Amino acid sequence: MSMTPREIVHELNRHIIGQDDAKRAVAIALRNRWRRMQLPEELRVEVTPKNILMIGPTGVGKTEIARRLAKLANAPFIKVEATKFTEVGYVGRDVESIIRDLADAAIKLLREQEIVKVRHRAEDAAEERILDALLPPARVGFNEDPAQSSDSNTRQLFRKRLREGQLDDKEIEIEINEAVGVDISAPPGMEEMTNQLQSLFANMGKGKTKSRKLKVKEALKLVREEEAGRLVNEEELKAKALEAVEQHGIVFIDEIDKVAKRGNSGGVDVSREGVQRDLLPLIEGCTVNTKLGMVKTDHILFIASGAFHLSKPSDLVPELQGRLPIRVELKALSPQDFERILSEPHASLTEQYRELLKTEGLKIEFKPEGIKRLAEIAWQVNEKTENIGARRLHTLLERLLEEVSFSAGDLAISPDAAPIEIDAEYVNSHLGDLAENEDLSRYIL
């Protein structure tokens, strides 16, 4: 990650409105990963990441920041919900499976990168195999005779036709590696055992091939993947993935507030304090056994987030609070924020609906006053009922464009037809009554 914090924030601004404090915190944390890797070895091992706790109501951008960060980081990343895990010894997934899933994500990410590197070689090898199936390979000897020369010319002709796609629908018989896939169902918490069994069965069937009749287009795709897989060095891939997890891994733990013990609640709760205590060694730094080998979690960055409606950050066990030293508060959205969300981000909601309906030949145009009124209604409904943040806009837009979306396929629309204008009057006529009536808005919006 060679992007500066300012560049990271600028990139996040393309998709997320407001929440500058949270963006700055994650940008600095991400840049610190790069800074650490520039240090001498003896100092590098001493520098641990400063984990982050994001606090804010639902629908203000906590999860979206994590999603966008994952794309920017180009590093092993996993998002989990704290509520999915149970204390060790109970039925359910234990927290160590987070690191096992992170290891899987690292292998997938690095394999994709390696396949891109060997793509051209794989395409050449796949092309030769398809040509071998279409006609016998040309043999060029010391005393080449005209028949062999013409054979070579035929091969070149077929190669040209193959590249131009003229042979795509031709059926050929080709030897393909036999995939040995075994579906194994197991109770929650036993994923590691099922993975090991699946790997065992896959290794047993390795090297077996079977003859299949396929169209050239399908065969070329399968053979290309097969050849790319052969060119990737699995041992080297695992070593790189292990280093990527340990040095650059990022874990985003959502809904951390749901495992906080609320002030006056008593009794034992399996999914709460026990999960927090299991998370402690993971965040502090421990060793977890994965398919890559033993993974040290000392330098994995953990970002936790929660709405904290019914509990407070201080309800988390003190040790966990200490392991999340950077606190960032995300603010509730204002009507102006809703207005910007509808119009400013790359691939905003209004742009998505406009392009979706354009596929039917229907043009819609969102007027500034219509967007402003829509933002006001979203804010009002959130204030009167449950505040679900920007997610309210999805509900309102679906309701607003329901009739248009339903009948768009039946309308014979001429290319020169004027666009449907979504202005303040249109918004009021479709949503005004629902927004004013609190009982209706509770159930419909």
Curated annotation (Swiss-Prot):
It is found in: Cytoplasm. It comes from the Bacteria. It comes from Pseudomonas syringae pv. syringae (strain B728a). One of its GO terms (biological process) is proteolysis involved in protein catabolic process. Keywords: ATP-binding, Chaperone, Cytoplasm, Nucleotide-binding, Stress response. CDD domains: RecA-like_HslU. Its main location: cytoplasm. GO terms for molecular function: ATP binding; ATP hydrolysis activity; peptidase activity; proteasome-activating activity. It holds the Pfam family AAA. This is ATP-dependent protease ATPase subunit HslU. InterPro entries: AAA+_ATPase, ATP-dep_Clp_protease_ClpX, ATPase_AAA_core, Clp_ATPase_C, HslU, P-loop_NTPase.
